[in-house]
């Protein structure tokens, strides 16, 4: 292991001169040994990104570069960033380097793994068609999740990605007796704090490992924190377990890559993103997969800049997912939560051979009715309901009931809404929507379907409204 000297600092990018015959490899971790400034973070870790030649390497600082100056000494570690893995990580909050940030002492783990790992080989993969029930009607009906699959929650600012993610954690992680890993990538510290207390109150903290790289941290931390969380999840998977891996938010991972790319002097591509966008996304997503030994079911929140799904970042994420749950601002504006768009959301599992003929027909019937209502909306706005044919009037009435029945009170939002959360089984969800589509609820007022769980609750609410 050789020592080097800092020759240039530009923000998070630091150039270091090493002896020509002993340069560190790409992705090797380096540590600051010279504490020549009271500002500089002790033992600051830097990751090699480029070899510029003549003994100079370009690195990204995984921490604040405040207080760094030319001439400071840096030592090579001879290995990539390695983080603790295994049972010692459960119930703990760690940073990108696997250091504890919950003030609960050191992490009791004997094994460390490098955060850069190859994706499983093609012959090791194991596709799954087993459904994962979430208890959220709109998701179970229109875009069902597969165990060991990848799910994306797409939405702009403030339409409920994190609340939906928390509800899924509440419904799946608490029911699912397995282990979970949560990677907070560039999100608000407050949300990480809320998540920790939520897990603590529900007594599942000892089954969750948490890794956070928040908004206020340098781009190097935000770029690598998803890999840190994934490395911990992979260890559990390789032990033969079924793991839940939550990432909030994949867009911030891309954004950190954009910041790093610009600092490294690469030419930007479309909309200012890094030219390696597809490759960086692929490196992460190809590792989030299920093998013959165990499975990783991943649920990822994806911020959609300016509500534009064609933006390169969400568009690149789409192709890696099995289910896409699209949250719509228009639906949120109607006061319908979860604000999932049933016409935009899709799933590979929505196939009669996987979900069964009845589920498939009911889901398609719901989508057809809503699509017809969408087509008629302009006519209604101009001419009013009276100009519609009886069939269209009936379709509109049913669509409005379906739209309201797709809403549901959440457990995690009880404190805000005052109404208790509801978990609806898949069988109840199918039965309820089948009754509406078949016209068995035509006599009920549409208000009866708003914010209820099962169809029986809608009938009870209708009696109270009369």
Curated annotation (Swiss-Prot):
The identity of this protein, by name, is: ATP synthase subunit beta
Q: What is the lineage of its organism?
A: Bacteria, Pseudomonadati, Pseudomonadota, Betaproteobacteria, Burkholderiales
Highest taxon above the source species? Bacteria
Keyword list (alphabetical) reads: ATP synthesis, ATP-binding, Cell inner membrane, Cell membrane, CF(1), Hydrogen ion transport, Ion transport, Membrane, Nucleotide-binding, Translocase, Transport
Query: Coiled coil: which residue ranges?
Result: none
E.C. code: 7.1.2.2
Q: How does it sit in the membrane?
A: Peripheral membrane protein
- InterPro entries associated with the record: AAA+_ATPase, ATP-synt_VA_C, ATP_synth_F1_bsu, ATPase_a/bsu_AS, ATPase_alpha/beta_chains, ATPase_F1/V1/A1_a/bsu_N, ATPase_F1/V1/A1_a/bsu_N_sf, ATPase_F1/V1/A1_a/bsu_nucl-bd
Give the source species. Bordetella pertussis (strain Tohama I / ATCC BAA-589 / NCTC 13251)
């Amino acid at each position: 292991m050789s020592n080097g000297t800092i020759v240039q600092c530009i923000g998070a990018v630091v150039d270091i001169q090493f002896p020509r015959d002993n340069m560190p490899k790409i992705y090797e971790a380096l540590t600051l040994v010279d504490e020549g400034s009271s500002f500089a973070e002790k033992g600051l870790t830097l990751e090699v990104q480029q070899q510029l030649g003549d003994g100079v390497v370009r690195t990204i600082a995984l921490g604040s570069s405040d207080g760094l100056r030319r001439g400071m000494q840096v030592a090579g570690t001879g290995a990539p960033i390695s983080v603790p893995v295994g049972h010692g990580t459960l119930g703990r909050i760690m940073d990108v380097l696997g250091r504890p940030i919950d003030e609960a002492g050191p992490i009791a783990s004997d094994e460390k793994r490098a955060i850069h790992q190859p994706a499983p080989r093609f012959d090791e993969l194991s596709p799954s068609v087993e459904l994962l029930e979430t208890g959220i009607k709109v998701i179970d009906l229109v875009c069902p999740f597969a165990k060991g699959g990848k799910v994306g929650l797409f939405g702009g600012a403030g339409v409920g990605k994190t609340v939906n993610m928390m509800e899924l954690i509440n419904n799946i992680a608490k029911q699912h007796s397995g282990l979970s890993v949560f990677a907070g990538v560039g999100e608000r510290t407050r949300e990480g704090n809320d998540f920790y207390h939520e897990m603590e109150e529900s007594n599942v903290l000892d089954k969750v490992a948490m890794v956070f790289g928040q908004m206020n941290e340098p781009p190097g931390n935000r770029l690598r924190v998803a890999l840190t969380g994934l490395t911990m999840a992979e260890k559990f998977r390789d032990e033969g377990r079924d793991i839940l891996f939550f990432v909030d938010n994949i867009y911030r991972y891309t954004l950190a890559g954009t910041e790093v790319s610009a600092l490294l002097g690469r030419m930007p591509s479309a909309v200012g993103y890094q030219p390696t966008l597809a490759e960086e996304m692929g490196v992460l997503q190809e590792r989030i997969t299920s093998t013959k030994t165990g499975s990783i079911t991943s649920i990822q929140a994806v911020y959609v800049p300016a509500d534009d799904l064609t933006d390169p970042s969400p568009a690149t994420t789409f192709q890696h997912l099995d289910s896409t749950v699209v949250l719509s601002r228009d639906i949120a504006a109607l006061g319908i939560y979860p604000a999932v768009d049933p016409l935009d959301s899709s799933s590979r599992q929505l196939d009669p051979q996987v979900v069964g003929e009845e589920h498939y027909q009911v889901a398609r019937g719901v989508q057809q009715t809503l699509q017809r209502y969408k087509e008629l909306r302009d006519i209604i706005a101009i001419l009013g309901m009276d100009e519609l044919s009886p069939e269209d009037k009936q379709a509109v009435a049913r669509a409005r009931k379906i739209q309201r029945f797709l809403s549901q009170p959440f457990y995690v939002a009880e404190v805000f809404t005052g109404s208790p959360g509801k978990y609806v089984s898949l069988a109840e969800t199918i039965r309820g929507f089948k009754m509406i589509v078949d016209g068995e609820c035509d006599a009920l007022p549409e208000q009866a379907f708003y914010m209820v769980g099962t169809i029986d609750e809608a009938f009870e609410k209708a009696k109270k409204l009369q």
